[in-house]
Amino acid sequence: MFTKWRIFAVNHQRTFSVHLNTMCYCKIKANLKRLKTQLPLTRNYSSAPGIAGSDVKSLHSVINPPVAKIRNIGIMAHIDAGKTTTTERILYYSGYTRSLGDVDDGDTVTDFMAQERERGITIQSAAVTLDWKGYRVNLIDTPGHVDFTLEVERCLRVLDGAVAVFDASAGVEAQTLTVWRQADKHKIPRICFLNKMDKTGASFNYAVESIREKLKAKPLILQLPIGEARTFQGVVDVVNKEKLLWNSNSDDGKDFERMPLSEASDRELLKETIEARNSLIEQVADLDDEFADLVLGEFSENFDLVPAEKLQAAVHRVTLAQAAVPVLCGSALKNKGVQPLLDAVTTYLPSPEEREDRFLQWYEGDLCALAFKVLHDKQRGPLVFLRIYSGTLTPQLAVHNINRNCTERMSRLLLPFADQHVEIPSLTAGNIALTVGLKQTATGDTIVSSKSSALAAARRAGRGEREHGKKREAESLLLAGVEVPEPVFFCTIEPPSVAKQPDLDHALERLQREDPSLKVKLDPDSGQTVLCGMGELHIEIIHDRIKREYGLETYLGPLQVAYRETILNSVRATDTLDRVLGDKRHLVSAELEVRPAEEPCAVAKIEYADCVGEDLLQASREAIESAVHSACLQGPLLGSPVQDVAMTLHSLMIHPGTSTTMVTACISRCMQKALKKADKQVLEPLMSLEVTVSREYLSPVLADLAQRRGNIQEIQTRQDNRVVLGFVPLAEIMGYSTVLRTLTSGSATFALELSTYQAMSPQDQSALLNQRSGLAHVL
C-alpha cells in the first residue's frame, strides 16, 4: 500500500508527507478518508493534491478534466515583484496547502530548492497542479532574475496563458520587458496583476500608464483599488459594479465580502466605476466586432445595461487575440485580491483547445508532446516534464523521440505538485505530465507515439520522401524547441582530487540536461573543465548544487567574460590533405574565402561557387558545414567563438574513396588558416543596464558608471526615485552589486540584460590580449 513515510523539517516545523506507490484508484479512494484524520499537517506536502484537505476530491476529477476546463498558465515578472508569494496564495485559496507559505520564512512550495529558500528567489520553474471552481489550473512559477531567463523561456513555450505580476510602486521594470518580449514571441495571452498595492508609493494609475507606454499594450481596467498604500482595503469589480472588501480581522484573507455598489454609501466610488466601465466597453467594442455590433445595436443608449457576461465574453476574445491585456490589482502579501485573480484566470485566459496549434492536424489524435524540463531524482533517475498537445500518455508506454531518433519506454506517469508527485494511470491532451524512464530525452525534444506515427504525420503534411527529404520531414514535425541563449561568463572548475574527476563529470552531465544554458567544455591546452553560464549568480548556484546534491567540494577559477571574435577583411586560403590509411588513399584539396558577413550572424554563413559540382556537394555538404562550424568554435586570438563571418567554397577536389572525416578535417584546417590570415577583432558583450536609485545617490552612481565605460541613454523619474538606463561592457560590471550597495547604502537596485556584442577599441583589445597571454599581440 504505502511504501514509506518521510518526515520533512521545513523551517523547524515537522511536516509529514505521504508518498503513494502504484495502486489502483479504488485502493487510493478507500484510504483517503482514513488518512484524512491521521495527518497532523501544518502544510500540505501530500503527494496527492487535496488528499488531506477537508474537501477530499475524486481522483478522476483531479487527473483528466475536460480540455475546456484546463488552464496552463505561468506567473512571470521582474525579480521581487511578488510572483512566488502570489503563487503561494493561489495554492492556499485553492485548497492545496493548509498554511500560507512565505518567501522570507523559506517555506514556500514552489521554491523547493535549498538555494531558493535561502535566497528568497525562484531559480527553477516549479509546476503546480490545482483546481479552482471546477477548473484545472496547471501553474508554473518562473524566475525573475536575468541569469535564469532560460527557465522563463522553457515554461512560456508550453503555456496557453500567463499572469504578469507588477510591483504597483515600480510599474514595468527591466526584467518585465524581457519576459514580455518572450511571451510576445510565443503569442501568449496575458492578464496583468498590479501587486503590492499596500506598499508605500504604490500608484495604480502610474503602473497602468507604464504598461501602456513601456510595453506598448492596451490595458483593460477590470478592477479599481479601494485606497492605495496604507489605505488599501480592497478592489472594485468594474465589470459587475461590485466592491470586494477583505475582513481586517482575518489572518489568511479567506474572509471577504462582495457587495454591489450603492448610490447611498458609495456615491463617488460608483461614479468612478461607471466611468471606468463605460470606458472599458468602448475599448472592447473598438477591438471586437461582435461586441461592437451588440453594443451599437441593443445598448447604444445606455451602456449600463450591457450584461456582465457579454462583456466578460468579449474581454476573453480580445485577450485571446492579444489585442489588449486585462488589468487587476491587489496585495498577495496582505492576502487581498488573489481570489478574483484566479477567477480572471479561468474567465479570460484560453483553454488548450482555444490555442491554434496547426501541427496537430497532422497527428489526427496520436500522441504529440514536448519535453520542456528535465530534473534528476536520486531514486527515480531523470524526471521529464511533458506538455501533452494531443493523444494520451499511460505508464509503460513506448514513445519515440523525433529529435534523437530513438524509442524509450516510460515506466511511470506522475502529476506534478512542486517537488511532490502523485502517480496516475493516464493523462490526456492539454495537461502537463511528469514522466519517469525517459533517459535520453532532453529539453526541447518532441515526443510521439512511434516512428511510424511521425512518418504518417509527415505524409499528411504533404512531405515527400525524396533524398534529404527525411530530414526535412523530421524538422517539419518538431515542435518549436527552447531557444538557449549563449553564455556570457565562464570559469574553470576543479574537483578536490583527480580521483573525483569522473564524479564531477557525472554531476555536470546531469546538470546540463536539467539546464541547457549551462555549457561545459574541456580546455584543449590545459585539460581543465570549463563552466560557461549566464551570469555570476548562475555559476554560483551551479557550484552550490554540486556541493549539496553530489557531495563534491569543487574549486572555481576566476570568473571571466565570454568574448567573441570576428574578422575585418576578406581572405582566401587553400589546403590539401593527403593520407594513406591501410591500403586506401584519402585526398582532399580545397580553396575557400572568408569575409565579414553583411549582417550580424552567430553562425557562419556558407556559400558555394558555381564551379563546385552539385554531385560533389550532395555527398559532402554535411561534412563541409560541420567543418566550418567546428573551425569557428575557437578563434585565433582568444580561442573564443567566431561570429559575423561568411565563407564561400571556391573549389573542392575529393579523391574517390576518401572518407567524409577527411573532408571535414581539410575544410576545417583551411578555414582556420584563413581566419589566422585575416585582420581580427575582439567583440565584447555589451549589457543594457537599469539602475533604480534615490535622488541623493544619483551623482555618485553616474560618476561610477562613467569610469566603467558606461553609456547613459536616459534618466527617468519613477515616483521618488531616478531610473538610469544605459549600456555598459560586461567586463566592467562584474561585482557591481557590492559596489552599488556601498555607493547607495544598500538602497539602489539594478538589472542587466545582454544587448549585443560590440567591437573593442584597439587599446582595450591590446590590454585584454596582453592580460590573457602575457605577451604583446601584433594584429
From Swiss-Prot:
Q: Quick check: keyword Plastid in the entry?
A: no
Q: Which GO terms describe its molecular function?
A: GTP binding; GTPase activity
**Presence of the UniProt keyword Protein biosynthesis in the record:** yes
Domain called tr-type G: residue spans: 68-353
> What catalytic activity does the UniProt entry give for this protein?
GTP + H2O = GDP + phosphate + H(+)
Could you tell me the EC number(s) of this protein? 3.6.5.-
- Report residues binding GTP: 77-84, 141-145, 195-198
- SMART domains, per this entry? EFG_C (SM00838), EFG_IV (SM00889)
Keywords from the named record:
GTP-binding, Hydrolase, Mitochondrion, Nucleotide-binding, Protein biosynthesis
Can you quote a single GO CC term? mitochondrion
Q: Which Pfam families match?
A: EF-G_D2, EFG_C, EFG_III, EFG_IV, GTP_EFTU
Q: Where does this protein chiefly localize?
A: mitochondrion
Q: What class of enzyme is it?
A: hydrolase
Report the locations given in the UniProt record.
Mitochondrion
Instruction: List GO BP terms, alphabetically.
Output: mitochondrial translation; ribosome disassembly
Q: Which domain of life is it from?
A: Eukaryota
Protein family (similarity comment): Belongs to the TRAFAC class translation factor GTPase superfamily. Classic translation factor GTPase family. EF-G/EF-2 subfamily.
Its annotated function is as follows: Mitochondrial GTPase that mediates the disassembly of ribosomes from messenger RNA at the termination of mitochondrial protein biosynthesis. Acts in collaboration with MRRF. GTP hydrolysis follows the ribosome disassembly and probably occurs on the ribosome large subunit. Not involved in the GTP-dependent ribosomal translocation step during translation elongation.
Against PANTHER family, the record matches this protein to:
RIBOSOME-RELEASING FACTOR 2, MITOCHONDRIAL, TRANSLATION ELONGATION FACTOR G-RELATED
What else the UniProt entry mentions is:
This protein may be expected to contain an N-terminal transit peptide but none has been predicted.
Name the record gives this protein: Ribosome-releasing factor 2, mitochondrial
Tell me what organism the protein belongs to: Mus musculus (Mouse)
